[in-house]
Every structure is written in C-alpha cells, then in structure tokens.
Amino acid sequence: MSGTKELYDVTLIGAGPTGLFGVFYAGMRGMKTKVIEALPEVGGQLAALYPEKDIFDVAGFPRISAKRLVEQCKEQADSANPDATYVFNQRVDKLNRLEDGTFELVTHTGERHYSKAVIITAGIGAFEPNRIPNESARQYEGKGVFYSVTNLPQFEGKRVLVIGGGDSAVDYALMVEPIAAEVTLIHRRDGFRAHEESLKKLAASRVHVKVFYELRRVEGDGNWVKKATIFDNRTGEETTIDVDCVIIGTGFKASLGSMLEWGLEIENKRQIVVNSKGETNIPGVYAAGDICWYPGKIRLIATGFGEVATAVNNAKAFIDPGSAAFPGHSSEQRNK
C-alpha cells in the first residue's frame, strides 16, 4: 500500500488496543480507515511484551489475558470496519501538511500515505528493553536469556532466574511461577517498585526472593544458558545456581523518536498534549491512549478507549463539518 496517493479519511498510527478501538469507531462513523504499525502484528506492547499477562482493569472483563484482549479488539474492529487497511513493519518518520490541507505520512522506508486526519495511538512510542551492562548475558540473548515473556509454555518445568524490582520483573516471576520448576527473583535493593497488589501475590507465591543481589555472569554450552552466578552487593559473596532461563525484567525505555520533530506540543518529551477533544496543537491531528497528555491524565487501557472514541468523533467533524461530533449510541447505529 505504498506509492499511491489514495486518500483516507483517517489514519491511525499504532495498532494497540486503543488504535484498534479507533478502527472500530471509525467504521461506525463510515470513515475510510488506514492503520500504520511499526510492529509486524496488531496489539502493540501487549502483543510484543506481555501477551501472557492477565489484565484485570478493563470494564466487562474480570480477568483477560493480553493476547485475548488484543484478539477481541481486532474482532470488534473488523465487525464495524472490515475494509480498514493495515500497514505493518512501517514506522512513520515524517508528518507533512500538504497545500490542500491533507496530510502526507512518510515512513522509515520511504512509503508515503495520505490522509485527511491523523490519530496518533502509538502507546509509549518506540520502545526497547533496558539491557543490563553484562556481556555474558548479551551473548545468550535468545539462548535462554529473555527480556519479556511472550511464550509462556517454554518456561514449563524450567529453573528460572528473574532480575529486577519493578512491575515487569514481578509480573514475569508471577507469570512463570505456576508452571516453572523453580523461580528465583533477585533485586539489587530491598525496596520494590512494583504494584502493591503484585507484591502481595509475590509474598504468597513460591518464588524465592533474594534482595541486594545482582547478576555477575551467565554460563552455558554456547547454545543455551546453564548456570548463573549472582552476588550479594553488600558483601561481594557469590552464589552459582543452575538455571534454564534468565528473564531480565528491568523495564523498557521509550521514545517519541521522530514525533518530537513534527511540531507537536510535547509534555516532558514523553507525551503529546491534547485538549478535551483529543486535538493536538496541529489541526486535524489527534492523539489518544498512553501517548497523549492532559491535566489529570491516567494511563490505562480503559481510558485510552474513551479517548480514541472522542478523537475519532471529532476527526469526523473536522473532515466533514456538517456531521455531528456525537452520532448517537452504537446500539442505535448497528440496529438500523
């Protein structure tokens, strides 16, 4: 879908849950829709980093895995917008306003896409793991050393070492604990930054927690990790343990990347400022989900759904001033 000047009503940048709900709502408004996603599939962070994680704070789902939520969001999007165009493995690097008021989106490979309105639903932006300064661990990346849990069954019956003290590390430890043979969690301090409820679950689990411990090195046979040496950072005393997998859960660093050069008003170099309509400071460009900011903003999947519905409705009014910003309820629309 590159090289043509086919014009879309709205283009969403990012196909996470917020973006997918935006596709659904754009379909409800009869908008010709395109989605550009830097990853090879829909789902954003949930699909790339936490597909096996259970989510508890989405209305209507007491408990749902991230993978299943993404599947449900895509199914919903397809139900209202089956003709939406998805473009994968493309990162939007440039956003240009053309003389006729429409937008040209240029990707990192030079593809050009055209749209009347743009909604940025890119989550936390581009992200990559915070790698620890340990050469032995880097040598075994993908060979037993992981930065996320994307395939839970591979940890079944395994001896797992998890490193970190934030939400990522604690979540990973709790995810693999029911199926792993043994789980050890080490943290360089005695204070954890994870959510209070997660820490309660950790305390009640069979995870071996060792504070003031860090990774010295990992060893293996060249094909897969076999051992890990950890040390007490107060005494320097080393302990070598047998491991089958090492999960480095030290979080991810995110960046807005080239979006910082688009002329958008940015909060703390991390989020795009929007008003109550989801509008940025550039007319016709909106933002929703974790990537947007306004006073009182709460970064939740649930709030992203409401934000993108607001953005889509106002984008519709922007490209078609004669249409209503609020079209009525979905039950009325779908039953016509």
UniProtKB/Swiss-Prot annotation:
Enzyme Commission number(s): 1.18.1.2
Keywords tagged on the record: FAD, Flavoprotein, NADP, Oxidoreductase
Reactions mediated catalytically: 2 reduced [2Fe-2S]-[ferredoxin] + NADP(+) + H(+) = 2 oxidized [2Fe-2S]-[ferredoxin] + NADPH
Gene3D superfamilies noted in UniProt: FAD/NAD(P)-binding domain
Signal sequence annotation: none
InterPro entries documented for this protein: FAD/NAD-bd_sf, FAD/NAD-binding_dom, Fd--NADP_Rdtase_type_2, Ferredoxin-NADP_redctase_2
Superkingdom per UniProt: Bacteria
Residues annotated to bind FAD: T18, E37, Q45, Y50, V92, F127, D290, S331
Main enzyme class: oxidoreductase
Family annotation (SUPFAM superfamilies): FAD/NAD(P)-binding domain (SSF51905)
Cofactor: FAD
Database matches in Pfam families: Pyr_redox_2 (PF07992)
Record GO terms (molecular function): ferredoxin-NADP+ reductase activity; flavin adenine dinucleotide binding; NADP binding
Cofactor comment: Binds 1 FAD per subunit.
Cited HAMAP family: FENR2
Alphabetized PANTHER family for the sequence: THIOREDOXIN REDUCTASE 1-RELATED-RELATED (PTHR48105)
Quaternary structure, from the entry: Homodimer.
Family: Belongs to the ferredoxin--NADP reductase type 2 family.
Identification of the protein by name: Ferredoxin--NADP reductase
Organism field: Symbiobacterium thermophilum (strain DSM 24528 / JCM 14929 / IAM 14863 / T)
